């Protein structure tokens, strides 16, 4: 499961995942596994634990990096690599000679965008209905028509409350992405 808070805070989930990462790091360090098994363990256990809640969480980039820190420290050194191995290589794809470890923040953003594309298209899906309602609320609050994700977050983002849609809008704007929606405009 995922630890949710009524106020929309993700602190309990953050603390839980941080504890899981530290526990994995301590257990892996104590186990003295062969290098190939450390890498395999990292990919098949703790990284799956970290990826599971990302579809709904709204962690900041610094929170994601704090969650990854104990895992990368033990995972890289246990795999025979330096702890301070360049992160561009660590998070880079195999096709570019990277290690293909997913950065949690990027993975979180991609999962949010994927869910928007998938769920807002189905008018009979409860998740989609909630996303549409949140988008409509943001549009009404800002007094905007058109696709909300096509507007500049840097200009307007400070005017809306922290929500799932707001986080996704911030992520997309940070990386220069735009997404059209089929949400009906107000008249």
Positions of the model-derived regions?
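Mixed-charge, polar/low-complexity N-terminal
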Residues: 27, 71-72, 76-85
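Basic, alpha-helical interaction scaffolds
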Residues: 1-61, 79, 110-130
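Residue-level recognition of well-ordered secondary-structure positions
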Residues: 22, 47, 72, 101-105
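Extended C-terminal regions of large enzymes
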Residues: 67, 81-187
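Short amphipathic alpha-helical coiled-coil/interface segments
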Residues: 46, 64-76
């Amino acid at each position: 499961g995922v630890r949710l808070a009524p106020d929309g805070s993700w602190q309990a989930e953050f603390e839980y995942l941080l504890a899981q990462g530290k526990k994995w790091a301590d257990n892996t360090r104590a186990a003295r596994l062969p290098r190939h098994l450390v890498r395999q363990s990292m990919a098949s256990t703790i990284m799956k634990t970290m990826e599971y809640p990302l579809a709904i969480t709204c962690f900041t980039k610094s929170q994601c990096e704090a969650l990854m820190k104990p895992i990368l420290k033990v995972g890289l050194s246990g795999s025979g690599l330096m702890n301070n191995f360049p992160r561009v290589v660590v998070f880079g794809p195999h096709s570019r000679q990277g290690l293909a470890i997913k950065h949690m923040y990027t993975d979180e953003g991609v999962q949010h965008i994927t869910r928007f594309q998938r769920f807002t298209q189905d008018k009979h899906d409860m998740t989609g209905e909630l996303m549409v309602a949140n988008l409509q609320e943001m549009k009404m609050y800002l007094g905007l028509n058109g696709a909300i994700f096509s507007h500049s977050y840097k200009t307007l983002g400070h005017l809306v409350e922290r929500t799932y849609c707001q986080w996704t809008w911030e992520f997309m704007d940070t990386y220069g992405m735009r997404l059209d929606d089929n949400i009906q405009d107000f008249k």
